[in-house]
């Protein structure tokens, strides 16, 4: 196949890509393209998740659904599970490889929509230079050749209710400034382990993604081949490190700001991950666990641990019904699991029915994007696109 002009240009750059071809099941709604080692996963605009086929709850629109958790297996391997979950999944997803002089090699996942929202559009137009260069600065999962893995999750913030300032810069005057997502690949190329990544991040002026209504902070879950892991969070113009913290969703976990978790989202996902992580003994187990926190599950009242509406404001109804006494530690320990489930089964029946109706009637869709299982010791990324569980890609150096 003839290479697009823009792709020929990039063969000269430190991004390893080759000719365009397609793979996957033609009967599925998921369209997949491969640019050499780069994967383009393109769900059609009308696609909904296979497993549940649920429409999105309109109250959820604009929320984030990403989750990540790590564990050192009995064989010593550091394994991280990650779901990249947004309220849309029509964006093309790319796997990017970089090999830059005096930097570590990386493999990472990115997405964008400049050149189209379907494989057909991109095949017809080619992949533009603008698209590919933008992807480099929105690589939200990265593994490098030393076994350092970093994944980025957004935080939901409402400054008017929390007093959290928009993160316009953590280190004004620093030689280097970059946005929250751009830091992921940069640290992967420059750092060999978690300690180096945390220290280097603090020398950079990192700023958040800001709109008129929200000041989005974020968190990076980092892990390396030594088994060291933790969460670095961007909040209030600060970078705060929580050492040996094993998971993140879309609320703050550091001790200084965790009381602001009620305006984030993901407590139900967080609870499920931590209540089952001890049973994870392999990469396959981790992949199975991550499937349980996809939004097609969380938004189905028959399968979620917390009422779906609780995801709108983090603790939501579960938090309020416990008189504000439900904490991250309680969810982590599973201490009140039976009480929470009983409460949801009984007192939340009407809310569940209302949510089911919204799921059926709302024209918008919630579509998961991808799931990653990273092995820091083998330096591998296993990527599954939620729209087709049987379509899995394994990447290594």
Predicted features by range, described:
Residues 27-126, 134-136, 141-142, 153-189, ...:
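C-terminal, well-structured catalytic/ligand-binding subdomain of enzymes
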Residues 19-22:
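C-terminal motif of bacterial Sec signal peptides marking the signal peptidase cleavage site
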Residues 1-10:
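Bacterial N-terminal signal peptides that target proteins for export
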Residues 194, 198-231:
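Aromatic- and glycine-enriched pocket-lining scaffold segments that form the walls
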Residues 11-15:
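Outer/extracellular conduits and scaffolds centered on Gram-negative outer-membrane beta-barrels
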